[in-house]
Regions:
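An aromatic- and glycine-enriched ligand-binding surface/loop that stacks and positions planar moieties
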Residues: 1-145
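Conserved, well-structured interaction surfaces
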Residues: 112, 117, 129, 133, ...
Length: 182
């Protein structure tokens, strides 16, 4: 076979990505603030309408047609899998200044509060960190270790309390975003 070197495919991918960024009409979502942009890509009932030009492909859910899921119920239950991010994944989030968290002295033994301090804002939009509030509320909610096997409770796809019952979540689930092209 005439196998091509990996650089050939990397160059093809770079060319396609450049063309996509210049001419697709898609763009990174910046409608709000750095403290909310990332999480709001995943917790809106419709992510493909309005000012959001980042989502390329999403699984559409619609309560009107009974097309629902149970993301909220799964995140609020000790019996529905207890999802949680791994410590290795959490450690991979950068610091707010762009430096690596794992370059900090003593990072392996830091408390949860210490390890989530001064991190890239997307960490606090991926897991419950100190000061986390549910969507459309102002009351801080601490992580419930009974709901997550790792201690790092995910909040992606997590909407308001009105969707907490089993099979009542209907926010769209992004599958492919412009950020993956960048």
């Amino acid at each position: 076979a005439d196998a091509k070197p990996y650089t050939y495919y990397l160059e093809l991918a770079a060319t396609a990505a450049d063309e996509f960024m210049k001419s697709s009409g898609y763009a990174l979502y910046t409608a709000e603030t750095p403290a909310t942009n990332y999480v709001n890509l995943f917790n809106k009932h419709s992510v493909v309408e309005g000012t959001n030009k980042e989502i390329i492909l999403a699984r559409n859910y619609d309560i009107q047609y009974g097309v629902v899921h149970s993301a909220n119920a799964s995140y609020q239950s000790a019996t529905l899998g207890r999802p949680g991010l791994t410590r290795k994944l959490v450690a991979s989030y950068l610091m707010k200044d762009g430096s690596r968290f794992t370059d900090k002295a003593g990072w392996q033994t830091m408390t949860f509060v210490e390890e989530t301090k001064d991190r890239d804002p997307r960490l606090a939009q991926s897991i419950r960190t100190p000061g986390y509030c549910r969507l459309n509320t102002t009351t801080p909610v601490a992580p419930n270790l009974g709901y997550t096997v790792t201690g790092y409770a995910p909040i992606k796809y997590f909407t308001g309390v009105e969707d907490d019952t089993y099979q009542t979540s209907y926010n769209d689930l992004p599958l492919f975003r412009t950020a993956e092209v960048y």
